[in-house]
Amino acid sequence: MAIKTYYDDDADLSIIQGRKVAVIGYGSQGHAHAKCLRDSGVEVRIGLREGSKSAEKAKEAGFEVLSNAEAAEWADLIMILAPDTSQIAIFEKEIEPHLKDGDAIFFAHGLNIHFKKIVAPKGVTVAMVAPKGPGHLVRRQFTEGKGVPSLIAVENDPTGEGTALALSYAAAIGAGRAGVIETTFREETETDLFGEQAVLCGGLEKLMMTGFEVLVEAGYAPEMAFFEVCHEMKLIVDLIFEGGLSNMNYSISETAEFGGYVSGPKIIDDHVKESMKKVLSEIQDGTFVDAMFKDVDAGQPGLKGLREEYANHPLEKAGKDMRSMMSWIANPLDETA
């Protein structure tokens, strides 16, 4: 099925310019959305919880900072950019009491709407604008006269103008310069979760850890194992990012290329594909999301335990030791502490 893509010429910027927009959250996406919207002539205020460390940054950027409830009462379009696990409480306690017919609530990820953890009043437009890039990239591209491709979707459309409103918002943050792709909350949510769990985070992380274990158990030095199964991953991913799998295979040695072709299917075989299908099924039927929120309600013992377990894997120690030799790496974690 062909996707439907929009550009600036398809958008009416005056629609979003006629709205009062509250951006809930001032993190990676929040600061980018707020600044780009303001530069596009939109009236914007920031909603934050009391005591938020982001409040000072938002004020320094020239925004009026309100509580989430005050922002929701003031606005007629509310973009919720708080973490998935925080959105439900924010919505129920601080946003929903102030919603009225004709208002709109927007999201950058569809999880809580798709799985009905958040249910908006029938008279409220529910839509999504999801840039396919981090906030700093969204902002930088915007200031350079470019844009980051974004997804839009509409879940509830009481006025019949939801798509036009979402497209106008997307254009105001620069997405129309690159392309705005129409999707659904279901498609965005389920594919996003699957990609994270089966490939980008869960799958890749375990692949590297298991490869490391195989080499070390076979008697190879942990440092060598780290280099071969983890450190060089960036080189490969950059090649794929720049030009696809074919570009990667063209750029590596013929030995690596041939080895990849003949051994890759031995690792990622039909059993792995069936396991991936099971992961997808548990996303689709809500099993994963229910388990995540059950853990959240209990104080996240599952997440915290797994986080500690993974952080203590021998691959992490080998990586820390080797990165200390690489002066060119700007490490986001303070590994000298």
Curated annotation (Swiss-Prot):
| A Pfam family matched in the record | KARI_N
All disulfide bonds of the chain are none
* Ranges where the KARI N-terminal Rossmann domain occurs: 3-183
User: Keyword annotations for this protein?
Assistant: Amino-acid biosynthesis, Branched-chain amino acid biosynthesis, Magnesium, Metal-binding, NADP, Oxidoreductase
Q: Where does substrate bind?
A: S253
Q: Name one GO cellular component term.
A: cytosol
Record's catalysed reaction(s): (2R)-2,3-dihydroxy-3-methylbutanoate + NADP(+) = (2S)-2-acetolactate + NADPH + H(+); (2R,3R)-2,3-dihydroxy-3-methylpentanoate + NADP(+) = (S)-2-ethyl-2-hydroxy-3-oxobutanoate + NADPH + H(+)
Q: Report residues binding Mg(2+) 2.
A: D192, E228, E232
Binding residue positions for NADP(+): Y26, G27, S28, Q29, R49, S52, S54, D84, T85, S86, Q87, G135
Cofactor note as given? Binds 2 magnesium ions per subunit.
**Which GO MF terms are attached to this record?**
ketol-acid reductoisomerase activity; magnesium ion binding; NADP binding
Binding of Mg(2+) 1 occurs at D192, E196
Q: Show the coiled coil region(s).
A: none
Q: In which pathway does it act?
A: Amino-acid biosynthesis; L-isoleucine biosynthesis; L-isoleucine from 2-oxobutanoate: step 2/4; Amino-acid biosynthesis; L-valine biosynthesis; L-valine from pyruvate: step 2/4
Question: Which cofactor is essential here?
Answer: Mg(2+)
GO BP annotations listed? isoleucine biosynthetic process; L-valine biosynthetic process
Locate the active site. Answer: H109
Q: What residues does the KARI C-terminal knotted domain cover?
A: 184-329
Per the UniProt entry, the Enzyme Commission number(s) are 1.1.1.86
Entries under HAMAP family matching the protein: IlvC (MF_00435)
Cite the PANTHER family for this sequence. KETOL-ACID REDUCTOISOMERASE, MITOCHONDRIAL (PTHR21371:SF1)
| Assigned protein family | Belongs to the ketol-acid reductoisomerase family.
- Provide the function of this protein: Involved in the biosynthesis of branched-chain amino acids (BCAA). Catalyzes an alkyl-migration followed by a ketol-acid reduction of (S)-2-acetolactate (S2AL) to yield (R)-2,3-dihydroxy-isovalerate. In the isomerase reaction, S2AL is rearranged via a Mg-dependent methyl migration to produce 3-hydroxy-3-methyl-2-ketobutyrate (HMKB). In the reductase reaction, this 2-ketoacid undergoes a metal-dependent reduction by NADPH to yield (R)-2,3-dihydroxy-isovalerate.
Q: What is this protein called?
A: Ketol-acid reductoisomerase (NADP(+))
Q: Which gene encodes it?
A: ilvC
